């Protein structure tokens, strides 16, 4: 029998919760470690639609990237608050939730490595090393196989990431050979 704890332990080997940023909330958000798991649903955010899909498909465990509970809950108001209703429906249907956020972003072979590999970057290095593991951390930096002018680079990003649009600020340098990336909200790191 596979349990919530078994799934959690396996995920933790891939992206240790110790790699999460101090401000983040990761791990078991809701549920019982001892519950049996037969079906898992993976999502970015635990939304009302995701929970409805989980209920309709008899899902035992949802694994999300973004935490179901990020800020401390002050109340569970079922008349007004959609998050409260999500939590109520999860509890009523005995569906557990595990969230792996910045630990998955930072992990070796985590989301930032995946984003770098989608661009076929070479000589990939960690942009901001984690204090506990120099092979892990937020962001990645690497070299393109060959330099691209800005227009071709934007087309390349759109193709590799399957995007319809890309916003760009074009500076004086119009040839791109080195790429730094940081999945998620990396605005705090722009001037680091």
How would you label these PLM feature ranges?
Residues 1-192:
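Hydrophobic structural segments
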């Amino acid at each position: 029998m596979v349990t919530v704890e078994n799934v959690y332990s396996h995920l933790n080997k891939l992206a240790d919760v110790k790699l999460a940023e101090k401000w983040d909330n990761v791990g078991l958000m809701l549920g019982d470690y001892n519950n049996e798991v037969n079906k898992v649903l993976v999502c970015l955010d635990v939304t009302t639609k995701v929970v409805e899909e989980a209920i309709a498909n008899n899902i035992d465990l949802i694994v999300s990237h973004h935490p179901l509970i990020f800020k401390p809950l002050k109340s569970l108001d079922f008349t007004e608050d959609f998050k409260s209703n999500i939590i109520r429906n999860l509890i009523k249907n005995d569906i557990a939730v595990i969230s792996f956020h910045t630990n998955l972003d930072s992990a070796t072979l985590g989301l930032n490595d995946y984003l770098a590999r989608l661009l076929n970057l070479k000589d990939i290095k960690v942009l901001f090393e984690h204090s506990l593991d120099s092979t892990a951390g937020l962001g990645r930096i690497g070299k393109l196989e060959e330099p691209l002018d800005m227009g071709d680079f934007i087309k390349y990003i759109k193709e590799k990431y399957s995007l319809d649009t890309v916003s760009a600020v074009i500076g004086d340098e119009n040839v791109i050979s080195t790429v730094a990336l940081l999945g998620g909200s990396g605005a705090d790191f722009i001037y680091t």
